[in-house]
Amino acid sequence: LGKKELKKFSNGSWTEFNISAGKPNLSFGLSDIIIDRNNTLWIGTRGDGVIAFNENGNRIKGLTTTPTQGGLPKMRVLSLASDTENRIWIGTISGLVVFNNASGVFDADVLDAQPIIILDDGTPRKLLGDETVNTIAVDGANNKWFGTENGGVTYTNPSGQNTIANFSKQNSPIPSDRIVKIAVDKDTGKVFFATDKGIVAYNSNVAPFGDSLGEVYAYPNPVRKFHDIVTIDGRNGTNLPKGTNVKILDVAGNLVYESNVVEGQQLQGGKVIWDKKNLAGTYVASGIYVVLLANEDASETSTTKIAIIN
């Protein structure tokens, strides 16, 4: 970015775009830049809100703290992230907000980012409150990871409504509660936390959704008494597609377990984690169990077996 120019390098040449219509004051500097699923560029600034730009038609819009024109909590934006639903998550020096309709950013007359409202012992409050949100990452299951200035890491489901875990120096190996950057390896499920006192990695056991349902397997197998969970996943580096229906039956054909790989039932993305419990919540007996899988429209199926040894 120049003073009011956006520069793109592609195929060995530079292209310049005038973004003065977004009224940026770039003397404050930039904090983050991302591209969403519509190829819209979102630019976070350190004092002038967010600039949205799409080179298709040279469309541009500046988003500020003004109601109906962004509704940001503060003009100083530190972090941006786009998820699989094309929602834009924005971390500022005073809280977190999200644009749920990023696709309409250039057409909407009224466009306000919204905080995520959660219930804390029955009392509504904003997710992360007024924390400074330094970094935001999205994993392979569309779950969210938020790194803050003083509060460590908050890990939520895709909508942000349910907190899966909180990590701090008191309850985890992270060396500091000041999180500078979070990065996710979507292939392995590892999440890397960069703090002001060092870097640590966490194995989230989350996999991205696959494109098609092929050969699957379960591990560990056989499953012994000291194994707490069984993972059902695709072979050869593939993962289960979103919406896959998974049924586990005993040898008599009785349904023991059923779960779709969707938000609200499984948060591991393109694989299923079974805790060896049946639909009544009790641990299953020793024996052979058959796993039946079908994709969302039942056009693809697969099967495997699990041996339980208690």
Describe these PLM feature segments.
Residues 256-284, 296-298:
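Glycine-centered tight-turn motifs at strand-turn-strand junctions
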Residues 30, 133, 243-245, 272, ...:
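Short loop/turn microsegments at loop-to-beta-strand junctions
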Residues 288-310:
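C-terminal tail/sorting-segment detector
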Residues 205-207, 218-221, 253, 274, ...:
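Terminal processing/anchoring signals of secreted or surface-associated proteins
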Residues 212-247, 259, 274, 297:
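Glycine-centered coil/turn sites that cap beta-strands in beta-rich domains
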Residues 188-190, 285-290:
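Short, conserved beta-strand segments of beta-strand-rich sandwich/propeller modules, principally
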Residues 1-216, 255:
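Carboxylate-rich, polar loop motifs that coordinate divalent cations or form catalytic acidic clusters
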Residues 244-256, 289:
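Short, glycine-anchored, charge-dense loop/turn motifs used at functional sites
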